[in-house]
Amino acid sequence: MDTLPFGLFEPAYRKGITGAALVVRGVLYFRNGYTPTVRKALVQCFEQYAAMVDEYHHALEVAAGQKPSKEGPLRWFYTEGKQPMAYEKAPAFERLATSTPGDTSLVATMTSADHKLATGFYDFSVFALGEWKATHNRGLDTLVFTVPRAFLEQRPGKFQALFTAMCEALPIVHGHAGYGVNLPPMELNANEASEYFYARRYGPGIDVGDPMGYSTVMLEGAIKTVDWIVALNADLVRAAGGADSLTLPPDWYVRQPFGDGGLIVQAGVAPQASVSAGPGKPPLPPPAYVLLDSALRPIIAEKMDILQSGTLDSTAPLLNTTIATEAWLKRFVLQPDQLTEQWRELHKTPTVGSSKAAVGANLSRFRKIMGLPEPVRSNGFGYDGGSPG
């Protein structure tokens, strides 16, 4: 059940289109999105995303016995102050990114939705503040990209490699990737209950809340959540106690250095929503996420504004109070004596070793195509699998 109908839990808003889609989502928070250098990097990130999902989309068509279409999966284009446009008739993202003045916010979303008010499995969104707002602490810039869950199995290593390449291309502050829920760009509120339904049904490893929400982009010196993959700049790595203080066993955690002291941590070989607690019991958090949360607890936000709003008519459960939001932020927190059991459970899960080569090969290719600087020296625990030094 990877999609839900529009307004499923909001009878007054129901439509016969898709209102929520369970996906694998990457989110990056960065600075200086008003500068030509970063705008150019954003274009490169989009071009690699588009090429990656186009190839996959066409391969699925061939596998289904269809003739490959000329278009990729993206169908709709949204930008600030304008009505949604059919993607093939919209201005290219490159044109928008390079023509939008630096003192004006760059806002764009491209989705694979079948209808302009719906959502789909593919989404690429950018919100980059204009110079005045960016230099007056009005929040971080945001890039979001998503793929269907099956993509990870059918294109091993590509998602992680693109996420890492984007971290190297942009002046990121932090980021995360894992399971999330795409909602319609123009109709978030009527479908937020569906997002929270997924998290309650499948488990705490599913992210909740708009990645571009005000309370999230305004976080200072903290991150909203751990996830399958977490990226931290050097300041946040230091605030967490330093890379050497992270007692994360390399058989289950990738630690990929980037930039000047930044670190990307991958928890487990694949994203997880939960682990089963048995019939009739609520799902338990994945051990790899619990232990990463414990390691990064000094920099994880304990308070935020509400993560969801819903509609005026909402009666379904939502994270629309500060109490519910704060409980969600601490959903991976366990008592110290319970953490010991999580280490034992972690050792029952697949190790990351055999998956790193595919990521490393794809990352090398992305770096070459995007013209990224030489990577920092290996620490022996990253995707390259090399020895330190």
For each predicted feature, which ranges?
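C-terminal interaction module
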Residues: 1-66, 185-389
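Internal, hydrophobic cores of structured domains that mediate oligomerization or house catalytic pockets
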Residues: 65-199
